[in-house]
């Protein structure tokens, strides 16, 4: 959630330090809580959660207590800097606007997370946990809508950040006709260095889930996962989206519910559209390993077009696709600006799909999301237009997301699966830049003191190896 440095950096830093909870040393690499457990592998923390919503939540909070407190610290600083609103505002919004629209099951799970964290001596409550879960949709979607509605004077210019490069393919485009799905998460490096949890969730009701995620968050959030009904999902954010429905259901609830309860593409689409609040508006790539069908749901607020195929592909890199979405949901988005990150990456994706038709598999997908091809400059260089993004290396930044020159953000993880792996509830994941480059925080801050406000939360982001995970792993 990067933003350019403002004159209020010092006061915001003071505000951050006043509200940040004490964060104890990280929990042991391996630990248990009831039926839940955790271990470290390949730069990821694998967390198994099992049982009722309360049990799943408590295990989550207890096993990741220090990581959750740390993640809250990140979202507090980033959101305060970007929106000029303090954590009290987000806690109160979580309580008064979001909570009444959260299903009872997930209210219980969120409460359980808070209790689990508290059991380890950390002073966070359920409103901190809900605000953390809404750490994208409140600052980047609700606050711009609220500022406009209230005609707020001197309101900061807030733009939803683009997140991710992804594709899904099937039929004649893939080796053996399998569904292949791949995704890399684009975020601030402060978030990305911590977005390294593999959640194996076996709920008392619904489907078993294997997904990546953030500490304390009940959904994948960058959204890559599989369930035991054969669904394979991912998404990328829609650039320059505008809109919010205060009576809608939070996106973090709808996306978790869809992966937990959907057994088909139709069911997934119905669940994630139900109560759509416009928060964290995404293009959803959905596959069904049972049928070989894939789908692309452009989930705007006013428009929600759906495309489907049993022999083809869908690529996504934060661009709006549908003309009505562009007209009514993303009126500032310019699809003809090929120098823009989202459009340049789309050109690269289309080229790769055409060039590699019939050969796409997991190994090739790993190479795709580690790629440094720049379709606009016609060079191979890690930058804001490469599928594996490195915005910290370029003066241009990404204006469409309000990422300034050399902003410390880009591709922070990679995940890939095919339908054969999904049948075994398995995936492969790469922590850090998928290309293998490490990010060194001290070196970056020395070169770019304008981002000194991030010093309390910016840390090294080492690139781990591609690592296989499966449900029930110990």
PLM regions: where:
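Short stretches within intrinsically disordered, low-complexity N-terminal or propeptide regions
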Residues: 6, 20, 24-27
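Bacterial N-terminal signal peptides
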Residues: 10-22
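A cross-kingdom feature marking charged/low-complexity
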Residues: 294-329
